[in-house]
């Protein structure tokens, strides 16, 4: 469930020891974080550490950050944890695409979609603009809820099977990574140790790493078999929901390139998710033809293309599409955008673009460059309507109208 939003955006103040600045993604600096909100339950002051985060986003003027609190704490109504991400959304001038993608995930009922809250961020007294406080992708009871895996104990056929958190990551940012036979780069996020997550210290043993590699490779090979063996390797409803959210958003990274997460519980199948990274989705990109609201994207990826060659799988996707349509999820995207924009607009948005005066200026990889915040929001809403209309038309051509539609 999403945390309750106050009527007014909260303010977050981070004061770094000796007024130092965050200059890299490796070095944690000691700091204090304080949150002011009209909701008394959201107010917080706690020691923390802070460093940079992100890949292409780290090279932008408005920097994203990682927080590691001194102790697990609830943040703005979200469950208590130590590890948090602060997303700057610099390339997305609506500041709304990441929130929209995650809202879609929540509406579909995906098992865990990272929760977030907007804040106005101040670092060392400097207003840095509107940020999103996000749950960091990791394992845990209120995150990707899979069993902890001990490298020395969990080695028998049952316990070795979970829990795992994997990422399709062409950057190979983890210690245990491999390429599948179809050249998909798979990395183990958990169990692992990157200095951030005290809950999952150590590395998978060689035996455990071989297990998960064999499991993923077997799942991939099953996609090429004419029977239905592949279903034993994947949570099919989760796969379909993950697919539809990313296809609606035409999410560039989700075409099995990077920021594609899968998790696996003990004795369970691979579950697509959590969702991540929508800032250059929904028409906010100017290369590879992904800016247009027409055409399949995720469907043509290495794994999904094999799934969509199966008529029964296509039928299941259509059935789920119709369910989302009847629930006003696919047809309610414009209202979702309006609600997000209304919450952060006026003062916070105005101050954001005073601090970062680039409205009306191209920023990588913008396709549309609007002169005002309102024009950026209107473009996003128009793009989403065209996208849903196109997808609906394609489904109708193959299957006819949704039942009861």
For each predicted feature, which ranges?
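Short conserved micro-motifs at the rims of enzyme active sites and ligand-binding pockets
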Residues: 24-25, 78, 144-146, 177-179, ...
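Residue-level detector of short, conserved catalytic/binding motifs and their immediate flanks
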Residues: 12, 31, 63-65, 84, ...
């Amino acid at each position: 469930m999403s945390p309750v939003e106050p009527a007014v955006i909260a303010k977050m103040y981070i004061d770094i020891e000796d007024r130092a600045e965050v200059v890299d993604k490796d070095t944690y600096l000691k700091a204090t974080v304080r949150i002011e909100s009209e909701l008394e339950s959201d107010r917080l002051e706690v020691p923390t550490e802070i460093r940079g985060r992100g890949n292409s986003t780290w090279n932008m003027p408005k920097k994203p950050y990682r927080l590691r609190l001194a102790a697990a704490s609830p943040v703005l109504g979200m469950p208590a944890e130590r590890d948090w991400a602060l997303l700057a959304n610099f390339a997305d001038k609506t500041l709304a695409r990441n929130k929209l993608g995650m809202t879609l995930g929540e509406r579909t009922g995906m098992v865990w979609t990272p929760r977030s809250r907007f804040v106005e961020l101040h670092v060392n007294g400097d207003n840095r603009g509107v940020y999103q406080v996000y749950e960091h992708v990791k394992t845990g009871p209120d995150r990707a809820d899979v069993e902890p895996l001990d490298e020395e104990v969990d080695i028998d056929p049952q316990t070795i099977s979970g829990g795992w958190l994997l990422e399709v990551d062409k950057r190979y940012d983890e210690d245990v990574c491999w390429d599948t036979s179809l050249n998909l780069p798979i990395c183990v996020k958990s169990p692992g140790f990157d200095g951030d997550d005290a809950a999952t210290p150590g590395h998978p043993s060689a035996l455990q790493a071989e297990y998960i590699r064999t499991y993923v490779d077997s799942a991939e090979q099953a996609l090429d078999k004419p029977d239905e063996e592949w279903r034993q390797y994947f949570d099919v409803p989760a796969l379909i929901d993950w697919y539809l959210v990313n296809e609606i958003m035409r999410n560039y990274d989700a075409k099995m390139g990077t920021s594609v997460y899968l998790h696996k519980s003990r004795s369970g199948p691979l579950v697509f998710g959590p969702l991540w990274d929508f800032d250059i989705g929904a028409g906010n990109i100017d290369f590879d033809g992904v800016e247009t609201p027409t055409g399949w994207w995720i469907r043509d990826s290495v794994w999904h293309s094999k799934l969509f060659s199966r008529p029964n799988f296509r039928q299941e996707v259509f059935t789920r599409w119709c369910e989302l349509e009847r629930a006003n999820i696919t047809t309610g995207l414009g209202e979702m955008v309006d609600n997000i924009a209304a919450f952060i607009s006026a003062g916070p948005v105005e101050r954001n673009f005073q601090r970062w005066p680039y409205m009306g200026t191209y920023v990588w990889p913008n396709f549309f460059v609007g002169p005002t915040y309102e024009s950026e929001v209107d473009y996003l809403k128009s793009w989403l309507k065209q996208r849903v209309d196109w997808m609906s038309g394609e489904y109708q051509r193959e299957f006819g109208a949704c039942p009861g539609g």
